[in-house]
Amino acid sequence: MSIALQVALVMVTILVILLIIGAPIGVAIGLSSAVSMICMIPANVSFATSAQRIFAGSNSFSLIAIPFFILAGNIMNNGGIATRLVNCAKVIAGRMPGALAQSNVVANMLFGAISGSGAAAAAAMGSTIGPLEEKEGYDKNYSVAVNVASAPVGMLIPPSNTMIVYSSIAGSVSIAALFMAGYIPGILWGGAVMILAGIMAKKRGYQAEERVTFKIAMKTFWQAIPSLLLIVIVIGGILVGVFTATEGSAIAVVYATVLSLIYKSFKLKDIPRIVLESAKTTGIITFMIGLSSIMSWAMAFTEIPDMIATAILGLTDNKILILLLINVLLLIVGTFMDVTPAILIFTPILLPICTAFGMSPIQFGILLCFNLSIGTITPPVGTILFTGCRVGGVTIESVIKYMLPYFAIIFVALLLVTYIPAISMFLPKILGLV
């Protein structure tokens, strides 16, 4: 057994043990990487290299967009924007069977597109639409299942922090192209949930709402336009080259702050609290990115990506089977690991395999985010699942059986994204981004 393989086994073993005993993911990544580096090079060189890699890994202009988008999302979550989006969604989906559940899905897509956070969308919609559904006699488990199943769409529809993290790790992958690539898969996910929610609503006898007048519909849309305009300004500005994703994220913060103050949904004294919440989240993400940079260097040094690629390619050279194996691996990883560290760890390992089979790094990025987004709604560490159940006042055990049909239809959507490149690549190509 080569020294590189021995070191790789040490690193993986320490990482797995630390995760099993409940160590924070950042600590597990950093400690396992540091030990493996000490095994390869002298301690003084190892410590110096680790410090340099932490700084280099987090010293990226594109990563500055993450704290700004997090702050913008938190401002909007506290700024009364959710209510206006819910009203808009009710007009769009009000005539469908199970109107409130359908409105929940549409509102999650809209709110997720603005905030970029699936957990924030689940919390906002659960506290806004949930009480309305209960008043109309909807089963609470059914309502929570629809909310949880549709909330991760916000991680695919831009702006998406997960795509920014992937772009920083993957290298020369355009953030604008990734943003555009996420639209159709995100809408596909949301549409699949709406179809199933409608079928189940019909069986349960949940009716459509009364038709609203044209005047009320226009008034509702008009009230939602300022919130939705944020998407147009940020994504449109990035696409036409007026500003970068980082500059667009700063504009999003200013716009969200001004809009929330105009709505009088919060006061200036609330801003320090919101900034502190955003800083905590940003600190966690940046910490993991820096430490994951050490792991990426250690994996490259020990040739772990090459060994894994050789092992997978040794099983079969069939592209369909290899992509299926990668999906299964990512689904398992997403069940036990949060999205950001999973992207940081597995992008250097799996991206070379997929590109070797002719898959675009953009399509792989969407495939990666899609798989790991499913992990956010599966136990034992599904953040969106926990958030939705907590806000909805139900237990995870009771809602899981209602989730099973949604898992099935989301897996079908995943296979379509995997094997039909046009779903991810159509918009980037037509807009000249690739």
List PLM regions with ranges.
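Alpha-helical transmembrane segments of multi-pass membrane transport proteins
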Residues: M1-V434
